[in-house]
Amino acid sequence: MANIKSAIKRAELNVKQNNRNSAQKSAMRSAIKAFEANPNEELFRAASSSIDKAKSKGLIHKNKASRDKARLASKLAK
């Protein structure tokens, strides 16, 4: 465990950020799975939105976001 006060604070913040990021990423995955189980326009918009939010927060790379959205759009079109 860290001894320096600022290091202790950073460690606590890292735990909070990790929890927040994990929840956001999990919500994104859940939205994608919901869409894949029942592809429709409403679930597509929700999944696409959650992917964009994860991208804007730096949780996923912009190219992965684009690839995922393209795959979802392809499934919606079928």
Curated annotation (Swiss-Prot):
Family matches, as SUPFAM superfamilies: Ribosomal protein S20
Positions of the region Disordered? 55-78
Query: Which molecular function term from Gene Ontology is one that the record holds?
Result: structural constituent of ribosome
**Pfam name, any one:** Ribosomal_S20p
Asked if Ribonucleoprotein is a keyword of the record, the answer is yes
Could you tell me the keywords of this UniProt record?
Ribonucleoprotein, Ribosomal protein, RNA-binding, rRNA-binding
| GO CC annotations, alphabetized | cytosol; small ribosomal subunit
Q: Which NCBIfam families match?
A: S20
Task performed by this protein: Binds directly to 16S ribosomal RNA.
What protein family does this chain belong to?
Belongs to the bacterial ribosomal protein bS20 family.
Q: What is this protein called?
A: Small ribosomal subunit protein bS20
| Protein's organism | Streptococcus mutans serotype c (strain ATCC 700610 / UA159)
